[in-house]
From Swiss-Prot:
NCBIfam families: PRK05710.1-2, PRK05710.1-3, PRK05710.1-4, queuosine_YadB. Binds 1 zinc ion per subunit. ATP binds at K242. Zn(2+) binds at C100, C102, Y123, C127. GO terms for biological process: glutamyl-tRNA aminoacylation; tRNA modification. This is Glutamyl-Q tRNA(Asp) synthetase. Catalyzes the tRNA-independent activation of glutamate in presence of ATP and the subsequent transfer of glutamate onto a tRNA(Asp). Glutamate is transferred on the 2-amino-5-(4,5-dihydroxy-2-cyclopenten-1-yl) moiety of the queuosine in the wobble position of the QUC anticodon.
């Protein structure tokens, strides 16, 4: 095993594992195996209202039925509050974050329109100079201006990516108004603490990557290599998800779903990879992955 490679799969326990999630799990697993590395699972259960009781255990059981067992015990984000608090305190001490009293409506009104390509509203910096009499609701990370705001990185699938944090995103939230930790802070702290060297995930998270790289720099932690795979969409062109009615995987017959996932990843035509046993499928799929993304020499 190559201790220099550490990858992970990070599902949210909002329901059972479905085909869209399987594609992400398979891609991250194949990349780890092709590199002879360690594959981890992190349960991203910070969003309490959306977390379904028992879903995390169900996801782990499904992964096991599909032949994907993490090399170390899974980590739950809900147990990581102290680590997130320590990271925020470091940023506060460095003067890189500030409290924000703006509501989403106030931000929308000040902008008149949100940038369509982002899941959060771009922030105009209203509270950068103070709360102006409003109560603190959230904590935001101050992004730089000018050329320093442009974050460029090479994605192993999507190639060179660039984003201007100042004009396209604005100062972004690290701790939400409801007291919950924002995804960007949690994932950066978790990846750093786990020693993650390679992140393989869906392209729906591509827009988050520049923010995460900037936050990594602020915290002085390494930046992993990134690979964003195409997401699975439904008949309406929407991302396949639990919210759009994605159904649970059939545990008792994993090979058809695995072959379809490999086909989605461009590794083979649907059904071309060997059936019969999981071992035969994974051996062929890992070789096919390594031919594109390396190295698996010998």
């Amino acid at each position: 095993m190559n201790p220099g490679y550490r990858g992970r799969f990070a599902p949210s326990p909002t329901g059972p594992l479905h085909f869209g999630s399987l594609v992400g799990a398979l891609a991250s697993w194949l990349d780890a195996r092709a590199h002879g590395g360690v594959w981890l699972v992190r349960i991203e259960d910070l969003d309490g209202p959306r977390t379904v009781p028992g879903a995390a255990d169900d996801i782990l059981a499904t992964l096991a039925h599909f032949g994907m067992t993490p090399d170390e015990p899974p980590v739950w984000q809900s147990t990581r509050d102290a680590a997130y608090t320590a990271a925020l305190e470091r940023l506060v001490a460095a003067g890189l974050v500030y409290p924000c009293g703006c509501t989403r409506k106030e931000i929308a009104d000040s902008l008149r329109a949100a940038h369509e390509r982002h899941t959060t509203l771009a922030y105009p910096g209203t509270c950068r100079t103070g709360l102006h009499g409003k109560p603190a609701r959230a904590w935001r990370l101050r992004v730089p201006d000018g050329c320093d705001a442009v974050i460029t990185f090479d994605d192993r699938w999507q190639h060179t990516q660039s984003q201007n944090l100042a004009t396209e995103v604005g100062d972004f939230v690290l701790k939400r108004a409801d007291g919950q930790w924002a995804y960007q802070l949690a994932v950066v702290v978790d990846d750093a603490d786990a020693g993650i060297t390679h992140v393989v995930r869906g392209a729906d998270l591509l827009d988050s990557t520049a923010r995460q790289i900037y936050l990594q720099r602020c915290l002085g932690v390494p930046t992993p290599e990134y690979l964003h795979v195409p997401v699975v969409v439904d008949a309406n062109g929407e991302k396949l998800s639990k919210q759009t009615g994605a159904t649970a995987l059939e545990r008792n017959d994993p090979l058809p779903a695995l072959q379809a996932a490999a086909a989605h990843l461009g590794l083979a035509n649907d059904g071309d990879l060997p059936g019969g046993t999981l071992d035969a499928f994974y051996a062929a799929a890992t070789d096919a992955w390594a031919r594109r993304f390396g190295p698996r020499a010998g």
